[in-house]
């Protein structure tokens, strides 16, 4: 169930402050965050936000199509290495 429109999008306060400071100064430094639950808002456009995936911070450049989505959607947490091919030669017996 999506969030109620009257509540507005959720963005962690510390992340919003960092974005506002950079917007007022006109700088575009990488912002490191652990807040995967924060919603991408139009104020973040053009910024690079390093989102934590549980192991490292993945840099995510915010574009117009990302507005309304969560930051965690752009930093995958699981790596799929593929299924191991069955070796028929070792199954003799």
Curated annotation (Swiss-Prot):
Q: Name one GO cellular component term.
A: cytoplasm
Name the coiled-coil region(s). Answer: none
Cross-referenced InterPro entries? Ribosomal_uS19, Ribosomal_uS19_bac-type, Ribosomal_uS19_CS, Ribosomal_uS19_SF
Please provide the Gene Ontology terms (biological process) for this protein: ribosomal small subunit assembly; translation
- Example GO molecular function: rRNA binding
The answer to whether the entry has keyword GTP-binding is no
Q: Which keywords does the record carry?
A: Ribonucleoprotein, Ribosomal protein, RNA-binding, rRNA-binding
Matching entries from PROSITE patterns are given as:
RIBOSOMAL_S19
Q: Name one Pfam family in it.
A: Ribosomal_S19
NCBIfam families assigned to the protein according to its UniProt record, in alphabetical order: rpsS_bact
**Family from the record:** Belongs to the universal ribosomal protein uS19 family.
Task performed by this protein: Protein S19 forms a complex with S13 that binds strongly to the 16S ribosomal RNA.
Q: What is this protein called?
A: Small ribosomal subunit protein uS19
């Amino acid at each position: 169930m999506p969030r109620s429109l009257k509540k507005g999008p959720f963005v962690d306060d510390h992340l919003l402050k960092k974005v506002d400071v950079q917007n007022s100064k006109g700088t575009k430094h990488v912002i490191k965050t652990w807040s995967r639950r924060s919603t991408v808002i139009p104020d973040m456009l053009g910024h690079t936000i390093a989102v934590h995936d549980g192991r490292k911070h993945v840099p995510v450049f915010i574009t117009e199509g990302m507005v309304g989505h969560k930051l965690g959607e752009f930093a995958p947490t699981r790596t799929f290495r593929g299924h191991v091919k069955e070796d028929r030669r070792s199954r003799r017996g």
